[in-house]
C-alpha cells in the first residue's frame, strides 16, 4: 500500500462536533485511526482552526459523507468581505487555540504509541518506518499570534511547525479569499506590515508558511519576502476549477520556481469546473487536477492535502479508508509506484526538510 502524508485535515475541530473517538472506526467524519490504517494514511498536518465566536455546532451528517454542516455554513458566511463577521479578539483566539492544542496533545497521549507528535522530517521518517501515525501541529490562520510574536515563539516550542497567515477572512496580518465561484483570488490588499514581519519571523523559526486561503496580493508579498519554498497545502488548479481558493497558473509557476509544493485539495467545490458541492464527483476529476499540477510544476512538487473532516469529499472516495481508490485511479492513468510514492510522502518530506531542516 502506498503510504500518504496528508497536507491538511480539520479533525481537531470535527472530533468534538461529531462526538466520536479518533481510535475507533466510525461512520461519521473522514479520519479515525482505523480508517487511516485501512487507507494507508500515515499522518499529516492537524489544523487548528478557530471558528467565529458564538457559532453553535450543529449535528453531523448521518452518513459521514461530509463535514459537520457548520463547516459549510462557515464558508457561506465568508462569500463576500462586506458580510464577514468582525475580526476576533486576540484573547478569544488564544483561549480557543490553547483548547485545540491541548486536544492535539491529548490525542497523542491517548494513542499508547500508535500515534506520535512529530517536530521534524526525521520524526516523520521514523514514524513511517515503525508504522506509527505521525501528527504535526498546524495553525490555519494566525489570529492567535500577538503583534510582538511572543506567542509564536511559545507555540513553536510547543510543536507548531506550519502556519497559514490567514483563513478566508482578514486579520491583523493579511487578507484571505472569500469563498466565491467563479472568482479570481486577486481580491483585496496584500500583507500588512505586521504580516510581512510574520513572514520573516516564520523564516527565522523555520515554520512553514501555508499559502492556501491567502489572497493573491498576499501570495506575492510572501513570494517576495520568504526565503523558504512556497507551499500551498490544500489548493487546486484555478484553470480547471475557477474557485477563489484555487491557484492561477502564474502562482503555480512561482511555486515551481521556489522549489515548493502544492497539496491537492479533495473538496468537490474546488475540483469541479462548475464549483458545485456535489459528492457524486468522480475520482477522475481529482486525477485531472493532479495531471495538470504535475505538468505545470513537475512530479516532485505535487502532493496531497485532502481537507478531510473540513470539506465535502467525492462519495467514491468518502474518507481516509478510500485513499486506495484514488491510488488505483492514478495507476489506471499510468502513474508508476515511484511517482505514487512521491505524491504520497516523498514530496512532502523533501519540502519539509528544506523548510524545517533535516
Regions found by a protein language model. Name each.
Residues 1-185, 242-304, 308-358:
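N-terminal hydrophobic targeting/anchoring segments and the immediately downstream early-domain regions
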Amino acid at each position: 500500500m502506498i503510504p500518504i502524508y496528508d497536507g491538511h485535515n480539520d479533525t481537531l475541530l470535527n472530533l468534538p462536533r461529531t462526538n466520536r473517538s479518533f481510535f475507533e472506526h466510525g461512520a461519521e467524519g473522514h479520519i479515525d485511526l482505523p480508517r487511516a490504517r485501512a487507507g494507508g494514511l500515515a499522518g499529516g498536518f492537524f489544523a487548528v482552526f478557530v471558528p467565529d465566536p458564538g457559532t453553535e455546532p450543529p449535528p453531523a451528517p448521518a452518513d459521514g459523507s461530509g463535514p459537520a454542516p457548520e463547516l459549510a455554513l462557515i464558508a457561506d458566511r465568508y462569500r463576500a468581505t462586506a458580510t464577514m463577521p468582525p475580526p476576533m479578539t486576540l484573547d478569544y483566539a488564544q483561549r480557543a487555540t490553547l483548547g485545540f492544542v491541548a486536544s492535539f496533545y491529548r490525542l497523542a497521549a491517548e494513542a499508547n504509541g500508535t500515534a506520535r507528535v512529530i517536530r521534524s522530517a526525521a520524526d516523520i521518517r521514523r514514524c513511517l518506518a515503525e508504522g506509527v501515525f505521525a501528527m504535526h501541529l498546524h495553525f490555519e490562520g494566525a489570529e492567535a499570534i500577538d503583534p510582538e510574536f511572543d506567542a509564536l515563539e511559545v507555540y513553536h516550542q510547543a510543536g507548531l511547525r506550519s502556519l497559514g497567515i490567514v483563513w478566508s477572512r482578514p486579520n491583523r496580518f493579511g487578507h484571505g479569499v472569500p469563498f466565491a465561484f467563479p472568482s479570481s483570488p486577486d481580491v483585496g490588499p496584500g500583507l500588512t506590515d505586521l504580516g510581512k514581519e510574520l513572514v520573516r519571523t516564520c523564516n527565522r523559526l523555520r515554520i512553514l508558511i501555508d499559502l492556501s486561503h491567502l489572497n493573491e496580493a498576499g501570495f506575492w508579498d510572501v513570494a517576495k519576502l520568504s526565503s523558504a519554498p512556497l507551499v500551498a497545502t490544500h489548493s487546486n488548479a484555478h484553470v480547471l476549477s475557477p474557485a477563489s481558493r484555487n491557484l492561477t497558473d502564474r502562482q503555480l509557476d512561482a511555486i515551481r520556481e521556489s522549489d515548493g509544493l502544492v497539496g491537492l485539495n479533495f473538496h468537490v467545490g474546488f475540483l469541479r469546473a462548475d464549483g458545485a458541492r456535489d459528492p457524486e464527483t468522480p475520482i477522475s476529476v481529482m486525477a485531472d487536477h493532479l495531471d495538470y499540477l504535475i505538468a505545470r510544476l513537475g512530479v516532485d512538487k505535487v502532493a496531497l492535502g485532502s481537507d478531510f473532516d473540513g470539506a465535502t469529499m467525492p462519495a467514491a472516495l468518502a474518507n481516509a479508508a478510500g485513499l486506495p481508490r484514488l491510488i488505483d485511479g492514478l495507476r489506471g492513468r499510468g502513474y508508476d509506484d515511484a511517482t505514487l510514492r512521491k505524491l504520497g510522502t516523498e514530496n512532502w518530506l523533501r519540502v519539509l526538510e528544506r523548510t524545517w531542516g533535516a
